């Protein structure tokens, strides 16, 4: 009989536990990375979607301002050129274009305010627009079929069920 395996039994269980913990950590890290990526992507493109929507609304007013139309066209052109990739070059390009988009959108809001000239309504500034965007992007919730069950789940459990 060979009793050498019995002497190494503790080491064997230690190694099995270590490998099991390592594999579980890899799964959890992947899940956290996926959640973070979804959140960042949602936050970035929420602002662009709101800009696009407000450009549609402003165009529907029919104000016929050449400056306004030119800036809206510029915003739409810049948005069409954005790539949805996640490599370093695309992210840097996105950040560069986002700065241009924000500045053009500020110009649109200022022009719109001058054209409307209604003193009774509060001015829509870009800061107000960004606050609305942050409020929307901060309310990220996953889709759940049964609301009662969702209230009892922690965010981690809900994310794992995605």
From Swiss-Prot:
Region (deca-GX3 motif): 17-53
Matching Pfam families: Yae1_N
InterPro entries, alphabetized: Essential_protein_Yae1_N, LTO1_adapter
Effect of residue 11 to G: Lethal at 37 degrees Celsius. Lethal at 37 degrees Celsius
A GO BP annotation: protein maturation
Annotated effect of mutating residue 103 to D: Lethal at 37 degrees Celsius
Phenotypic consequence of residue 147 to G: Lethal at 37 degrees Celsius
GO cellular component terms given for this protein: cytoplasm; nucleus; Yae1-Lto1 complex
Effect on the protein of changing residue 146 to S: Lethal at 37 degrees Celsius
Miscellaneous comment as given in the Swiss-Prot or TrEMBL entry: Present with 784 molecules/cell in log phase SD medium.
Protein family membership: Belongs to the LTO1 family.
Oligomeric form and interacting partners: Forms a complex with YAE1; the complex bridges the interaction between the CIA complex and RLI1. Associates with the CIA complex (via its C-terminal tryptophan).
Name used for this protein in its record: Protein LTO1
């Amino acid at each position: 009989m060979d009793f050498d395996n019995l002497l190494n039994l503790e080491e064997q269980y230690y190694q099995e536990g270590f490998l099991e913990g390592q594999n579980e950590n890899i799964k959890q890290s992947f899940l956290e990375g996926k959640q973070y990526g979804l959140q960042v992507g949602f936050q970035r493109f929420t602002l662009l979607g709101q800009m696009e929507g407000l450009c549609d609304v402003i165009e529907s007013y029919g104000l016929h301002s050449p400056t306004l139309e030119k800036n809206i066209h510029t915003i739409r052109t810049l948005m069409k050129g954005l790539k949805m990739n996640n490599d370093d070059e695309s992210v840097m390009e996105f950040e560069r274009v986002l700065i241009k988009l924000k500045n053009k959108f500020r110009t649109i809001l200022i022009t719109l305010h001058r054209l409307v000239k209604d003193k009774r309504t509060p001015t829509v500034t870009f800061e107000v627009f960004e606050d609305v965007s942050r409020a929307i992007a901060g309310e990220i919730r996953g889709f759940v079929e049964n609301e009662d069950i969702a209230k009892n789940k922690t965010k981690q459990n809900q994310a794992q069920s995605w």
